[in-house]
């Protein structure tokens, strides 16, 4: 995110207390604790790739739907007590992923934290390279044990609440100058340090980059990759992804990252189906997910669009019907924890994300194939967007189906009649309209519908929120879940 922030939160506990605590943690070798700390993560992490390469599974091979929030600025903004409050809230709302937490926070997104310290003023590094004493000259080969003990504890608190944590080892909005000042060898060494330290935590994955706009510069790309390579040299198990340029990109747009990553993240402020399908169709095949789009309560994009519940809802359903395996939600107040964030944590968008999770978790979402050839939905599709189309203005209808003909799912962002080729289903089907604003179903009269010919479907009016978007669910008779 490229929003400029001020007024860092005041620590609630005296700095001296935290410093003593951090040293005690280090001296008792926190890293020796079991990486599955917390009953919420037992038997789940680390996540891995499914046998067909299309989605994540846990350690029991159960499909893992990414339901992520994005607390990027947590290390620079929150006390441990605040972090636990936040994690507990996210667990209660059905989140299973924190994607992502920056190792250290400084630069354009954190202008009030010039030294990238924790709220109680612990620096991430203890020395500087030649040329200056600001954060861009931190010596990456001199990590501060007290600081990283704090990050250890944050990861363990997340594990306690069943949360997978994507760690950004050195985000690239503010820290590219630091990498340039350190050079390739130090960047690789820093990655090795992180790999050794965090390979013992099961609930970890890695998110490299962050608005990495200069990835086409081979020197910058090599520096960011050096950190990732260093991590992987010590820890080949935990998965990596990378966020490339704003405003639209996919991880695999830079093919040199392909050997390093296992997840293809989509970044877009345009209608999400466009870039999601681009990601889904890239090779090598990887799980695709919505890495970053509009955050709730924040205007972003070019042209800008405000993150209303309707906008983030469209992005969520378009994603899942365009090859997605989940998404990172975001919120203006909780990606950076600006003052007042506690009053903006349980929003309409979070409630509707919980509804989204419940809906797709009731289905074999991992088997959905995007209806790119329009053989399932043959009419009423609306207009395919452009990169300048605002999410709030796009009326494009997305659809997906399971290869065995059990389900066809259609998302309509605006009211219209759609035509479905009923032969896409293996048997006569039960048809329901799902309201994405309150999670209720409305049966389509006259069912079950024969699986022959074409059938038109029209939504039953306004949804509970007073908007026009609905989900059409067609489930073949005998389907296991509906």
Where are the language model's segments positioned?
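Bacterial N-terminal signal peptides that target proteins for export
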Residues: 2-18
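Bacterial N-terminal signal peptides
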Residues: 15-29
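Signal peptide processing junction and immediate N-terminal pro/mature segment
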Residues: 28-36
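Aromatic- and carboxylate-lined catalytic core of secreted/periplasmic carbohydrate-active enzymes
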Residues: 37, 296-298, 310-447, 458-482
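Short acidic, Pro/Gly- and aromatic-enriched capping/linker segments at domain boundaries
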Residues: 37-57
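Active-site mouth of glycoside hydrolases
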Residues: 50-263, 267-274
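Active-site clefts of carbohydrate-active enzymes
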Residues: 212-213, 246-247, 261, 276-312
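Short strand-edge motifs at loop-to-beta-strand transitions and within beta-strands
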Residues: 453-455
């Amino acid at each position: 995110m490229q929003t400029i922030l001020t007024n860092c939160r005041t620590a609630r506990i005296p700095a001296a207390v935290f410093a003593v605590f951090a040293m005690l943690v280090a001296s008792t070798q926190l890293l020796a604790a079991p990486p599955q700390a917390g009953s919420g993560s037992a038997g789940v992490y680390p996540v891995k790739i499914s046998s067909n390469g299309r989605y994540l599974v846990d350690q029991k091979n159960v499909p893992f739907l990414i339901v992520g929030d994005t607390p990027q600025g947590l290390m620079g903004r929150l006390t441990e007590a605040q972090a636990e409050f936040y994690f507990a809230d996210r667990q209660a709302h059905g989140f299973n992923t924190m994607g992502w937490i920056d190792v250290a926070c400084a630069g354009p997104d954190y202008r009030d934290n010039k030294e990238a310290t924790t709220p109680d003023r612990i620096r991430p590094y203890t020395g500087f390279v030649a040329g200056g004493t600001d954060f861009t000259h931190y010596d990456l080969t001199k990590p501060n044990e007290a600081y990283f003990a704090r990050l250890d504890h944050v990861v363990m608190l997340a594990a306690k609440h069943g949360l997978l944590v994507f760690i950004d080892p050195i985000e690239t909005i503010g820290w590219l100058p630091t990498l340039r000042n350190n050079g390739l060898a130090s960047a690789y060494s820093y990655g090795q340090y992180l790999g050794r330290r965090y390979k013992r935590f099961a609930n970890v994955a890695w998110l490299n980059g962050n608005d990495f706009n200069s990835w086409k510069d081979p020197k910058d790309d090599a520096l960011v990759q050096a950190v990732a390579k260093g991590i992987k040299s010590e820890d080949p198990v935990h998965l990596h992804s990378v966020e490339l340029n704003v405003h639209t990109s996919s991880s695999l747009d830079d093919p040199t990252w392909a050997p390093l990553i296992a997840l293809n993240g989509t970044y877009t402020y345009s209608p999400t189906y466009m870039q999601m399908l681009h990601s889904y169709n890239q090779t090598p095949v990887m799980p695709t997910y919505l890495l970053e789009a509009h955050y709730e309560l924040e205007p972003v994009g070019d042209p800008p669009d405000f993150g209303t519940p309707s906008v983030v809802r469209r992005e969520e359903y378009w994603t899942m019907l365009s090859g997605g395996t989940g998404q990172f939600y975001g919120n203006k107040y909780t990606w950076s924890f600006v003052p007042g964030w506690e009053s903006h944590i349980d929003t309409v968008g979070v409630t509707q994300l919980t509804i989204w999770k419940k809906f797709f978790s009731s289905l074999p979402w991992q088997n959905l194939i995007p209806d790119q050839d329009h053989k399932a939905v043959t009419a009423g599709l609306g207009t395919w967007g452009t990169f300048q189309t605002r999410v709030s203005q796009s009326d494009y209808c997305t659809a997906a189906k399971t290869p065995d003909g059990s389900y066809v799912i259609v998302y309509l962002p605006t009211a219209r009649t759609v035509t479905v080729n009923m032969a896409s289903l293996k048997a006569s089907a039960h048809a329901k309209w799902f309201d994405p604003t309150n999670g209720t179903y409305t049966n389509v009269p006259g069912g079950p519908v024969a699986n022959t010919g074409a059938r038109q479907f029209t939504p039953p009016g306004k949804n509970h929120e007073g908007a026009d978007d609905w989900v059409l669910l067609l489930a073949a008779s005998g389907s296991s879940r509906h």
